[in-house]
A protein has these predicted regions:
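Short, amphipathic alpha-helical "lid/cap" segments that border enzyme active or binding sites
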Residues: 54-62, 143, 157-162
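Short, flexible active-site recognition loops that position polar ligands and cofactors
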Residues: 144-152
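Amphipathic terminal alpha-helices
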Residues: 153-169
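Oxidoreductase cofactor-interface core, primarily capturing Rossmann-like NAD(P)-dependent enzymes
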Residues: 2-101, 105, 112-117, 121-123, ...
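Flexible coil/turn residues that form the inter-helical turn or adjacent wing/linker of helix-turn-helix
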Residues: 81, 139, 153
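Short amphipathic alpha-helical segments at helix boundaries and their inter-helical linkers
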Residues: 132-133, 137-144
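Residues that form generic nucleotide/phosphate-binding pockets
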Residues: 113, 149, 163
Length: 169
């Protein structure tokens, strides 16, 4: 089994990633790829997604678990605005003071790359399907779930990348 850590691997994520690697567990982490190559590889150079900060996800989970009135409801979480992968990398480039580029891969090549990294073929195909969904615009929406359940706005991509910039250096 391979663990996918797509976002920054900051203090907590970095510790989790390192423990998995130390235990010999295959990990595909976005931050190490960016750190090593200054590129992010994917299919979805178009299409936008409102990325969620993991802390917002955790805050919502705590709120839902503590409030039986929210149980059994559908809670779709998003960040506050939609970005494309190239736009997210522009923000990261500004944080790092050097350019991080988006490298477009073909679907077969990306599946093969993920399998080589240790993903089961079915999971690799699922991740590529997710990229297609982004390109098709299926994730181009934002929700108010974080605000509704926590009483505050969701964290922005700029905040997340600023706070985790050292993971990409």
């Amino acid at each position: 089994m391979t663990t996918a850590i797509i976002g920054a691997t900051g203090r907590i994520g970095g510790a989790v990633t390192q423990r998995l690697l130390d235990a010999g567990h295959p990990v595909l982490a976005g931050a190490p790829e960016i750190k090593k190559t200054r590129t992010w590889t994917g299919l979805a150079d178009s299409g936008r997604v409102a990325l969620s900060d993991t802390r917002d996800v955790a805050d919502v989970i705590v709120r839902v678990l503590g409030d039986p009135a929210t149980w059994g409801q559908h809670h779709e979480l998003t960040g506050p605005r939609q970005v494309s992968w190239p736009e997210a990398l522009e923000v990261l480039s500004a944080e790092l003071g050097e350019t991080v580029t988006f490298r477009t891969a073909d679907a077969f090549g990306l599946v093969q790359r993920l399998v080589k990294a240790g993903f089961p073929a079915g999971m690799a195909e699922l991740l590529v399907t997710r990229e297609w969904a982004i390109m098709a615009g299926e994730n181009e929406r934002t929700t108010t779930t974080v605000r509704d359940l926590t009483g505050r706005e969701p964290r922005t991509i700029e905040e997340f990348l600023h706070e985790n910039r050292d993971s990409f250096r």
